[in-house]
């Protein structure tokens, strides 16, 4: 369930981003599904061109065709904020459906953010995306314009975490999407089945309807704003940055592993009048972060507050430090934010996660920034 990078694992080196090495056809099963359903203009798997950039025309056609196949009504374009991460278009050969959707720049390359936004619209979850944005902003937390659609896309499993040795395949929200990424997402959507009250789409809408954050103090808002600003960044083994890093011999454009995400928010990020906040967390790994806090200061599940760092162990609350394998940041009302298989994403502290919750720590209190 969690990305392997949260546990001890060997990492083989991979090709660097932008190298001449042919990218593996990692989405072959999903591409076959897309071709079978006559999506994205491809007539065969062999002619699909998975590593080509996704164009505006192809994405518009895909969204329209998914609406037709799923029976979802057309929805207005998602507009929580004007788009801010559009990639300038360049001329690219594009395949289209028989009746192409009308777009202003057919050959323009589409970003990962634009891919997720279009697909969330196509499956009728625009309102859900807006409700996640509204829930955060109502609590005074600033969020990027992509926040709602990225939360929804990841709750639906529309993104794939590539193996650590292939972290060069990971794409940031602002990076041009590939046809393979679009095919993976489309195949996931087609797997949801009937659109009834028990469907995955209906469940995500229900979660959005109830998304409310508790009252936050100023420091909690600052911490969550930084954490939320990373929504949609990919999971990268050893990653701690939005920018290019070489982690364990693999060049990645940017991203975070579970402890790297917490490290960025509390250790590397600078805040006005932060006092000793950056020195509260000393260790870089999940294990060291978890054992730095004495047992008497560990936070139980029922006592969690927003901006607490939370840890998960193989034996839940009976875990010791050596059994801790994952970490995240508590958001409030049963939600937390993490970097895992879905990249940086919101998740509910229920079920599998609740059973493995070990303890939390409160860096804001440790730094003397709140009682």
Task: Locate the predicted segments by residue.
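Feature responds to low-complexity, polar/acidic, surface-exposed segments characteristic
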Residues: 1, 13-28, 40-60, 64-149, ...
